[in-house]
């Protein structure tokens, strides 16, 4: 459960920051592959970004951790992400 919370908080900070008014479609593909795809799908989604080997390894470790979550939880994280991204709140600067 801690992994799911960590991923959700990470996605919120990236997706709703004032610097991300337009979200990179490639990022969303990587995120979807991370949560719902196979390890090879995830690695293929990362490939266009040409990550250094240490970054690639860290991403693969994260993918393996995410894969330990129940499928329903991963699907619900995707639904939560979609809800957040389509929310009018993402158009506002929510920082205190």
Curated annotation (Swiss-Prot):
Major location (coarse): secreted
Compartments (UniProt record): Secreted
Pfam families to which the protein is assigned, alphabetical: Uteroglobin (PF01099)
Tissue specificity of this protein: Club cells (nonciliated cells of the surface epithelium of the pulmonary airways).
SMART domains (UniProt xref): UTG
UniProt GO molecular function: phospholipase A2 inhibitor activity; polychlorinated biphenyl binding
Keyword Secreted carried by entry: yes
Protein name: Uteroglobin
Organism: Rattus norvegicus (Rat)
């Amino acid at each position: 459960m801690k992994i799911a919370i960590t991923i959700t908080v990470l996605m919120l900070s990236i997706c709703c920051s004032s610097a991300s008014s337009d979200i990179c479609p490639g990022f969303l593909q990587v995120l979807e592959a991370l949560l719902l795809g196979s390890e090879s799908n995830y690695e293929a989604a990362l490939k266009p970004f040409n990550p250094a080997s240490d970054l690639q390894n860290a991403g693969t470790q994260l993918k393996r951790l995410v894969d330990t979550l129940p499928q329903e939880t991963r699907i619900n994280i995707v639904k939560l992400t979609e809800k957040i991204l389509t929310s009018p709140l993402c158009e506002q600067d929510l920082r205190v």
